[in-house]
Design a protein with these regions (language model features):
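Activation segment signature within eukaryotic-like protein kinase domains
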Residues: 110-111
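ATP-binding glycine-rich phosphate-binding loop
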Residues: 2-28
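Conserved short submotifs of the Hanks-type protein kinase catalytic core
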Residues: 77-92
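Conserved HxN/HPN-centered segment at the entrance to the catalytic loop
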Residues: 63-72
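C-lobe/activation-segment region of protein kinase-like
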Residues: 146, 150-190, 194
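AlphaC helix of the protein kinase catalytic domain
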Residues: 92-102
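Protein kinase catalytic-loop region centered on the HRD/HxD motif
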Residues: 116-126
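AlphaC helix of the eukaryotic protein kinase fold
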Residues: 42-61
C-alpha cells in the first residue's frame, strides 16, 4: 500500500489551529482520524521538533473518556512529523459561544466531565496550556465533551499557581458559556465569581472544592455530615458493647 492510499482526504481545519500547530482531518486506511503537525515555519527547527515529540510522549499514555486519545506519531507526506489522534470532529465551545448555540446540556458537561478531565490532568502532573473555549470540543455525533490540547510536559508536581490558574481559567470559560446561553443560575454564577476572584487566596482551594460548589454543596457541610455519621457510628458501637445493653430475647 502506497502513502497516497494510506492517507486520503486530508483537509486543513484552520478554526482548530493552535499557536505552533496546524490541525487536519484525514482518513488513515479508510478510518477518520485527526492530525496535529507543526506549522510550516517551525517544522525544520530542532527546538520545535523536540517540542512535538515531548507532547506525544507526555500524552500517549493518558486515558480518559473526555480527553482526546493519541494513537500514533509518524511522518505524513507534505505534513512532516505528526501526532495522530482519534477523530473528534464537531464544534468547539468557541464556535458555539460565537453562534449563541450553547445549551444547558453543554453547561452540564462543563460542570461534570470538564472538571473530571481537569482533575485527571492535575493528578498526572501534566503541565498544560490555559483552558479556553477553543480547546473544548463537543463531538458531532453524540455531543460528548472532549479536551483537545491537554498537555506538553509531565512533571513531579504542579505549582500552587498552576493549580489556581486552572480554577481561574475554568471560571472564565464557564462564565462565557453561561452568557452565551443566557443562563442565570445563581449557584453557577457564584462559582464563576469565586473562580475568577483577582485574589488567588479567595478562589476555590482545589478542584474537589470546586466540584462540590458546582453541585451546590459546600466542603464544610460535607465534613460536618461525615463527622455526624462517624459520631453516630461510635455511639452505636459503644451501645452494642455496653454491659447495660438489654440481653437478646431467646
Amino acid at each position: 500500500m502506497t502513502e497516497q492510499t494510506r492517507w486520503t482526504e486530508i483537509e486543513h481545519l484552520p478554526d482548530w489551529d493552535e499557536e505552533f500547530y496546524d490541525i487536519y482531518t484525514a482518513k488513515k486506511f479508510g478510518k477518520w482520524v485527526m492530525i496535529k503537525t507543526l506549522k510550516p515555519e517551525y517544522r525544520d527547527v530542532p527546538e520545535y521538533q523536540a517540542m512535538i515529540e515531548k507532547e506525544f510522549d507526555t500524552r500517549y499514555n493518558l486515558a480518559h473518556p473526555n480527553i482526546v486519545m493519541i494513537n500514533d506519531f509518524e511522518d505524513i507526506p507534505t505534513l512532516g512529523r505528526c501526532i495522530v489522534t482519534d477523530d473528534v470532529y464537531g464544534d468547539t465551545l468557541r464556535k458555539l459561544i460565537n453562534e449563541k448555540r450553547v445549551n444547558m446540556s453543554h453547561i452540564s458537561q462543563m460542570r461534570h466531565q470538564l472538571v473530571n478531565a481537569m482533575s485527571y490532568i492535575q493528578t498526572n502532573h501534566i503541565a498544560h496550556p490555559a483552558l479556553k473555549p477553543e480547546n473544548i470540543i463537543f463531538t458531532e455525533n453524540i455531543g460528548n465533551l472532549k479536551l483537545i490540547d491537554v498537555g506538553f510536559e509531565q512533571r513531579p508536581s504542579l505549582s500552587r499557581r498552576e493549580l489556581s490558574d486552572d480554577i481561574y481559567n475554568y471560571g472564565v470559560v464557564l462564565g462565557e458559556a453561561l452568557d452565551a446561553c443566557g443562563c442565570d443560575d445563581t449557584t453557577l454564577r457564584r462559582v464563576v465569581r469565586r473562580c475568577t476572584d483577582p485574589n488567588p487566596a479567595h478562589r476555590f482551594r482545589d478542584l474537589e472544592q470546586l466540584h462540590l460548589a458546582l453541585e451546590g454543596r459546600s466542603q464544610k457541610r460535607f465534613y460536618v455530615l461525615v463527622a455526624i455519621t462517624l459520631a453516630l457510628m461510635v455511639i452505636l458501637v459503644a451501645w452494642l458493647l455496653s454491659p447495660w445493653r438489654p440481653a437478646p430475647v431467646m
